[in-house]
């Protein structure tokens, strides 16, 4: 994966246009790589997310989270306690844990030291 990342960072800037059926995470990653910016966990990538894509990213992460729950052998269909857990966890990560990653940074206001 590190080799792939290094290879993509050195790739030409003219990456393919957004294809129908391509996961939104791939589209966002392509934009970040094309700009030759890093995307570590604490980096803000909001400038590379187009309007409406965060909702699609939530759907994508929900699907991935559901596969994690399935791999953990958790019955999310018949256990009312775990229904919609994949969506709740995905939402928690995107809108709470990593909120500063996907939204524009607020304006910084300086106050004089009194």
Locations of the language-model features?
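Active-site loop/lid in soluble adenylation, ligation, and acyl-transfer enzymes
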Residues: 11-114
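Short, Lys/Arg-enriched N-terminal segments with co-localized hydrophobic residues
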Residues: 1-7
């Amino acid at each position: 994966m590190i080799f792939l990342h290094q290879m993509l960072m050195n790739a030409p800037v003219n990456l393919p246009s957004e294809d129908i059926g391509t996961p939104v995470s791939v589209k966002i990653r392509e934009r970040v790589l094309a700009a030759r910016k890093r995307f570590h966990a604490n980096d803000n990538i909001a400038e590379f997310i187009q309007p409406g894509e965060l909702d699609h990213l939530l759907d994508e992460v929900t699907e991935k989270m559901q596969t994690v729950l399935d791999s953990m052998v958790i019955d999310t269909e018949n256990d009312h306690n775990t229904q919609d857990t994949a969506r709740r966890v995905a939402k928690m990560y995107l809108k709470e844990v990593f909120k500063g990653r996907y939204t524009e940074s607020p304006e910084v206001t300086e106050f004089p030291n009194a």
